[in-house]
Amino acid sequence: MNVLSCSINTLNGLYDLSGVEVGQHFYWKIGGFQVHGQVLITSWVVIAILLGSATLAVRNPQTIPTGGQNFFEYVLEFIRDVSKTQIGEEYGPWVPFIGTMFLFIFVSNWSGALLPWKIIQLPHGELAAPTNDINTTVALALLTSVAYFYAGLTKKGLGYFGKYIQPTPILLPINILEDFTKPLSLSFRLFGKILADELVVVVLVSLVPSVVPIPVMFLGLFTSGIQALIFATLAAAYIGESMEGHH
């Protein structure tokens, strides 16, 4: 009887687990288009957190920074170092772009683990981290692509396209394909990591007591921060590469 009872409990747990759905969306109709409402909601929350915390931190700037001002100046210095290392001496104009990418992705990733999105009920789907949706990560990757094309064209003009036949015209298809694979690799790496992290936590919570997934959640927080850094570093590296013209 104990074996039978145990088997039934296991099957019930697996049945509950099979009810976990991925990919349901809450749509808003804007004009003739359908947009993912839950992505916009969570993105607005993340933007509000960033703007609110930055405003509070620098509302009374001090010559000798303390508290929140000190923290944000440290973050700015860190982003400047990353940008300078990857882009070179002309990094200055790109610090806001790289910093925005890093902070948005970082806070988005952490919001998936720290904010109780599920208490907000939607007619369809559920709220989750913005980077848990492929549309967000693809949009961020496409922005990066536009940025490095803009950087290259601004620096070299139409001569920028000469890189596609370097070191030999035979490599033209490969060099073109490389520029298309950059946004794909950026978007799918970030999306896959965040989605996999949330699914692992859901699976463990469904099968084992709630205290067991806690170490996995802490690991997820760490790797989420690393993913934000990787995305920002690669974006800066691509921009620097387009300006210098080397691979």
UniProtKB/Swiss-Prot annotation:
One of its GO terms (molecular function) is proton-transporting ATP synthase activity, rotational mechanism. It is found in: Plastid, Chloroplast thylakoid membrane. CDD domains: ATP-synt_Fo_a_6. Gene3D superfamilies: ATP synthase, F0 complex, subunit A. Pfam families: ATP-synt_A. The chain crosses the membrane at residues 38-58, 95-115, 134-154, 199-219, 220-240. The keyword Kinase does not apply. One of its GO terms (cellular component) is plasma membrane. Keywords: ATP synthesis, CF(0), Chloroplast, Hydrogen ion transport, Ion transport, Membrane, Plastid, Thylakoid, Transmembrane, Transmembrane helix, Transport. It comes from the Eukaryota. PANTHER family: ATP SYNTHASE SUBUNIT A, CHLOROPLASTIC. Key component of the proton channel; it plays a direct role in the translocation of protons across the membrane. Belongs to the ATPase A chain family. F-type ATPases have 2 components, CF(1) - the catalytic core - and CF(0) - the membrane proton channel. CF(1) has five subunits: alpha(3), beta(3), gamma(1), delta(1), epsilon(1). CF(0) has four main subunits: a, b, b' and c. This is ATP synthase subunit a, chloroplastic. It comes from Guizotia abyssinica (Niger). The gene is atpI.
